């Protein structure tokens, strides 16, 4: 079984069977908010530790929302490439905060409001990831995202050695 498939299955199993808090030190789940406007609404990142020597990092719905601005303040209105770059810049910052990098990503889900942007998405991905092997990715066309000005959003799962 390829390692990526094994890790993805292990990741899903961990989410389905893990409690919402640590029990007997076996599994530790921590939930994080990195933007002021998301506090009390949802967790932008969740880490799961205690499954072997792995720390799973799950990032939810990273887009071009200004993490330092008011709720719904989206940067680069109408500019797909710049929204993509901004989203992946946030992904890199949040992964780094949790001890991970793009090299540790094993799964990406990309949501875009217009599939005609897929070639521009490809360029953004090449520019962002450089020589890093890109993980599995599912591209999904959607009618809308969290805010009307958003045209791209990504979910990322990464796995690193627990410390």
List each model region and its residues:
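Positively charged n-region of N-terminal signal peptides that target proteins for export
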Residues: 1-5
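N-terminal presequence-like segments and the immediate start of the first folded domain
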Residues: 6, 10-89, 93-107, 113-163
